[in-house]
């Protein structure tokens, strides 16, 4: 989900805004959940990308909630999903909540 360029931008956002708490490998820490692997899959199973987008947009980063721009959040989600083995696409993930809500988070193929 998301283009290669969007995943790269998301990786940059993650490194600057998220890795200190969630770990460089998205493994999480005592205070921040894992964003990869079985923990991520269990936490977001059968949810939609819109819910993930809104959670990140409204509550992250923890030291400055709501400070990320909508395009940064979409880029970040593209990176997180790609890290979790979701394939990239020809189109970028949108920043529109309704469009994102239609995308279910299921096990990658």
Please report, for each region that a protein language model flagged, where it lies by residue.
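Non-catalytic cap/lid and distal C-terminal segments of serine-dependent acyl enzymes
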Residues: 6, 16, 23, 31, ...
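Flexible coil segments in periplasmic/lumen-exposed cytochrome c-class electron-transfer proteins
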Residues: 65-109
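An acidic site on a long C-lobe helix of protein kinase domains
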Residues: 6, 48, 68-72
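Electrostatic cytochrome c docking/interface patches
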Residues: 1-13, 29
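Gly/Gly-Pro-rich "capping" loops immediately C-terminal to redox-active cysteine motifs
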Residues: 27-61
């Amino acid at each position: 989900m998301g283009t290669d360029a969007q995943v790269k931008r998301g990786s940059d956002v993650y490194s600057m805004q998220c890795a200190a708490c969630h770990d460089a490998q998205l493994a999480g820490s005592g205070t921040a959940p894992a964003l990869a692997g079985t923990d991520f899959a269990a936490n977001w199973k059968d949810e939609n990308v819109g819910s993930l987008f809104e959670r990140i947009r409204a509550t992250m980063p923890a030291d400055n909630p709501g400070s990320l721009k909508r395009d940064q959040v979409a880029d970040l989600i593209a990176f997180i999903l790609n890290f979790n083995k979701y394939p990239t696409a020809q189109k970028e993930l949108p920043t529109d909540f309704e469009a994102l809500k239609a995308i279910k988070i299921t096990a990658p193929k």
